[in-house]
């Protein structure tokens, strides 16, 4: 039987291609769509959004709704990156990882 992750943390960024130099409107809309997902915590950073959930499916849903949002805004090409840290041995939140790194 597969072990269920205690918490999954992911770094996600999305970039509409061909929409000009500033993409803040599109990124803001994507973040708004992510904020509606129950059971998903997020932290916006200057270069990406960090996602946290005990359910990997919620993180993948955030990617899906972000792409759908940008398509609705007229983006004809979308590039995104997703880096996932799924820890199974003990619970670690975004805040725990930051505290650990700072010492």
Residue positions per predicted region:
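Charge-rich, low-complexity N-terminal segments
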Residues: 2-103
């Amino acid at each position: 039987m597969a072990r269920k992750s205690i918490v999954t943390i992911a770094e996600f960024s999305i970039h509409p291609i061909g929409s000009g130099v500033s993409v803040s409107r599109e990124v803001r809309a994507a973040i708004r769509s992510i904020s509606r997902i129950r059971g998903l915590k997020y932290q916006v950073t200057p270069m990406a959004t960090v996602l946290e959930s005990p359910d990997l499916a919620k993180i993948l849903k955030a990617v899906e709704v972000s792409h759908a949002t940008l398509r609705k805004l007229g983006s004809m090409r979308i590039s995104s990156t997703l880096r996932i840290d799924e820890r199974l041995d003990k619970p670690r939140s975004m805040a725990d990882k930051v505290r650990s790194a700072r010492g």
